[in-house]
Amino acid sequence: MHILEFEKPIAELEGKIEELRHLSDGGDVNIADEVSKLQAKVDKLLRSTYAKLTPWQKTQVARHPERPHTLAYISTLIEDFTPLAGDRAFAEDEAIIGGLGRFRGRSVMIIGHEKGHDTETRLKHNFGMAKPEGYRKAKRLMEMADHFQVPIITLVDTAGAYPGVDAEARGQAEAIARSIETCLNVRVPLVSVIIGEGGSGGAIALATGNTVLMLEHAIYSVISPEGCASILWRSAENAKDAAEQLRLTAQDLHKLSIIDSVVPEPMGGAHRNPDLMMQTLSMALDSALRDLSGLDGGVLRARRREKFLEMGRAGLS
């Protein structure tokens, strides 16, 4: 497992546990009591460490390479998933995954950023940084869901939209704006979940939902801490300071009413117990969809638009 800097004391204890278990395999020494005591220390240290994470530490957890990504959630939560590809204008962008499936018996359209889990898949999915064709694909799938009256689930996990010259030449800003516009206009329930990183316009292009959920240790911000530090302090080395100022944690954003609910993560983060994370998110999604089911399409659309317009009015009165 990839160990974060602040997790090293925990990892050392876990290493001792593994050593003792290895010795115990020989059957010569009964060390069950010692293992039990060390495990209790690990659990206590995990709780105390993760209960007081700084914004910068939460940023590291949100970026953890073993954190579950969109494809993992789809394979666990969605039955009969049928992937849909291409923007019908230029190309397929595998930074955004989307398709139809069934969630707890109901048909849904699910769309999300995919970062990949190793070198090969990270390159394939462009580290979750979508190009214009990715956002145009998302727009197409949302319009399809609207046409067939199918609820939409979006999973957000990106450092930001791809900033390359080729993406700009193909209208990156326009594609993001059209995706946001489509989110605001559909007349079906739309539930968005920030599962890892929620970076800038590349994130909000899929996060303009009726209900916005956010995992406990995810982050959501107008800019990355490194990008903010490079602008304000002229050095990315001040990323820790920038993270403190950006109010990017789920807890801060819930207080500011930017998100609707914080979804608890397993002790030690989603990467330590992906199965439990899937179960918890499944229940949260089911509850959110139930709350929205039965509402008229016009009401869903009006509430969603008003929700985000109200954010823009903050501090004006």
Curated annotation (Swiss-Prot):
Pfam family membership, one: ACCA
The protein's annotated pathway: Lipid metabolism; malonyl-CoA biosynthesis; malonyl-CoA from acetyl-CoA: step 1/1
InterPro entries named in the record: Acetyl_CoA_COase_a_su, ClpP/crotonase-like_dom_sf, COA_CT_C
Cross-referenced PROSITE patterns: COA_CT_CTER
Any Gene Ontology biological process: malonyl-CoA biosynthetic process
Highest taxon above the source species: Bacteria
EC number: 2.1.3.15
Compartment(s) where it occurs, according to its Swiss-Prot or TrEMBL record: Cytoplasm
Span of domain CoA carboxyltransferase C-terminal: 41-291
UniProt keyword Nucleotide-binding present: yes
Keywords linked to the UniProt accession: ATP-binding, Cytoplasm, Fatty acid biosynthesis, Fatty acid metabolism, Lipid biosynthesis, Lipid metabolism, Nucleotide-binding, Transferase
Catalytic function, reaction form: N(6)-carboxybiotinyl-L-lysyl-[protein] + acetyl-CoA = N(6)-biotinyl-L-lysyl-[protein] + malonyl-CoA
Example of a GO MF term: ATP binding
Purpose: Component of the acetyl coenzyme A carboxylase (ACC) complex. First, biotin carboxylase catalyzes the carboxylation of biotin on its carrier protein (BCCP) and then the CO(2) group is transferred by the carboxyltransferase to acetyl-CoA to form malonyl-CoA.
Recorded family membership: Belongs to the AccA family.
Description of how the protein assembles with itself and partners: Acetyl-CoA carboxylase is a heterohexamer composed of biotin carboxyl carrier protein (AccB), biotin carboxylase (AccC) and two subunits each of ACCase subunit alpha (AccA) and ACCase subunit beta (AccD).
UniProt name for this protein: Acetyl-coenzyme A carboxylase carboxyl transferase subunit alpha
UniProt lineage: Bacteria, Pseudomonadati, Pseudomonadota, Alphaproteobacteria, Rhodospirillales
